[in-house]
Amino acid sequence: MDEREALIKAGEIARQVKKEVISLIKPGTKLYDIAEFVERRIIELGGKPAFPCNLSINEIAAHYTPYKGDETVLKEGDYLKVDIGVHVDGYIADTALTFRVGMEEDDLVTAAREALENAIKVIRAGIKINEIGKAIEETIRGYGFNPIVNLSGHKIERYKLHAGISIPNIYRPADSYVLKEGDVIAIEPFATTGAGQVIEVPPALIFMYLRDRPVRMAQARRVLMHIKREYNGLPFAYRWLQGFMPEGQLKLALAQLDRVGAIYSYPILREVRGGLVAQFEHTVIVEKEGAYITT
């Protein structure tokens, strides 16, 4: 399987899982059950999770994934963002959508969805990425909402979810990277009723291996070896390690690894004023005259 075939296969799996998860999005469903279903289906369909299933409600924009024992359930009217990552041999599909639990789509959800559609329409080899930001910003503001300025899409490479280039959700002249044929990018507009910025809040439930570092604690060394071997430098969930060792030891090990820079932690991201947030995302391959949507 070559690179393009693997990217397309990962996208097909992500698309299928998005369809299947709809039946679980109803009041009373536990976030834990949704995340476990999504990640299990990815594996059953022949892929692997490229990152933990993110399930972020209302003012939480990103980086919430449930843990074992998490009793959070969906309530009617919740804005649930489901962000799914699949990889096939390291080639990644990253996609997201927003549901209003038990209710019809409203203008906030429509604004984010249309921002994604309009952004994809401008993509082709040779454009500057600020043209994507312009399409997103104009669409979201046209509905009377704010784009989240400190969240962005991203270039993707093999085993690299964020490959150094950010795809903005607003127009900035300085965003002058020119798209090349064959670039793989994730476009992910976030629309909010709030101020249009996110802040980090504890706890971190998602982590990523960065580098080997000497650590005192034997349990920390064990965790480091395990995550390096298992996840190929892609993000992993605290939930995936629950049961690997006693909970208290695991928390201490992760804290030590984070402190010495062996791992990166992803704090939960909340809209600064507590505004509601909607998100949509596709992964696309840049072509000469357009974009091939893999997801």
Swiss-Prot record:
Its cofactor is Fe(2+); Co(2+); Ni(2+); Mn(2+). InterPro entries: Creatinase/aminopeptidase-like (IPR036005), Met_Aminopeptidase_Type2 (IPR050247), MetAP_archaeal (IPR028595), Pept_M24 (IPR000994), Pept_M24_MAP (IPR001714), Pept_M24A_MAP2 (IPR002468), Pept_M24A_MAP2_BS (IPR018349), WH-like_DNA-bd_sf (IPR036388). Substrate binds at H63, H162. The keyword Glycoprotein does not apply. A divalent metal cation 2 binds at D94, H154, E188, E281. Removes the N-terminal methionine from nascent proteins. The N-terminal methionine is often cleaved when the second residue in the primary sequence is small and uncharged (Met-Ala-, Cys, Gly, Pro, Ser, Thr, or Val). Monomer. HAMAP family: MetAP_2_arc (MF_01975). This is Methionine aminopeptidase. The lineage of its organism: Archaea, Methanobacteriati, Methanobacteriota, Thermococci, Thermococcales. The gene is map.
